[in-house]
Regions:
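Membrane-proximal helix-turn-helix segments that form the acceptor-binding/catalytic region
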Residues: 1-10, 36
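A short beta-strand/loop micro-motif in the catalytic core of glycosyltransferases
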Residues: 7-15, 21
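Conserved catalytic-core segment of nucleotide-activated headgroup transferases in glycan assembly
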Residues: 55-169, 173-177
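Carbohydrate-associated surface elements
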Residues: 16, 52
Length: 180
């Protein structure tokens, strides 16, 4: 509580945590005499940080979005796996979300298949610059080359890069698209 009281505002992840902090009271005693000096209790605001989803936006009833429909028309496969997340720094299979490992596993699982699904990577390294897009495409190609060399694969499944910011409604349309 002493640390929390030094903050202007403390954010917690649940109402339970907020209530525990708000209801916590400790007696402060002199270590030598044991005499009660006062009480330690919450003096600063604590708020719950919403970490859920907005069901008014993310649901199966939402209409399709033109931008998503246009992107998905370019995907020839009837089914695609979707990955959404940042592809952060790190060597092969050492990046935080192991996107490189995901790609490696996907390619190895569906190599040389006549009716392989696609993989849609809705990713960036934290920005949507052209430099970032080119770098990510290069990393995907490096992994494809490594899989071909290691396994002598003659055919690899398609990977599509969706490298842009999307609105919540566009994301919902992507999650609910029939190909995903």
């Amino acid at each position: 509580l002493e640390g929390i009281n030094r903050m202007d505002l403390t954010l917690v992840s649940s109402n339970f945590t907020k209530e525990v902090i708000q209801n916590s009271v400790f007696d402060k005693k002199d270590q030598n005499t044991g005499q009660l000096l006062g009480q330690l209790k919450l003096e600063k605001p604590v708020e719950v940080l919403f970490e859920g989803i907005d069901l008014e936006v993310y649901n199966e009833k939402a209409p399709s979005e033109d931008r998503i429909n246009k992107v998905m028309m370019d995907i020839e496969e009837p089914f695609a796996f979707l990955f959404v997340g940042h592809w952060l720094k790190g060597e092969f299979q050492q990046d935080r979300k192991n996107v490189s490992g995901l790609i490696w596993t996907f390619l190895n699982t569906f190599k040389n298949k006549s009716k392989a699904p696609a993989l849609i990577l809705k990713t960036s390294s934290g920005g949507t610059s052209l430099v970032d897009r080119v770098r990510i495409k290069k990393m995907i190609e490096q992994i494809k080359t490594a899989v071909k060399e290691d396994t002598k694969a003659t055919k690899l499944p398609n990977i599509y890069l969706l490298h842009s910011d999307l609105t919540d409604w566009e994301m919902n349309a992507l999650y609910n698209h029939p190909k995903v």
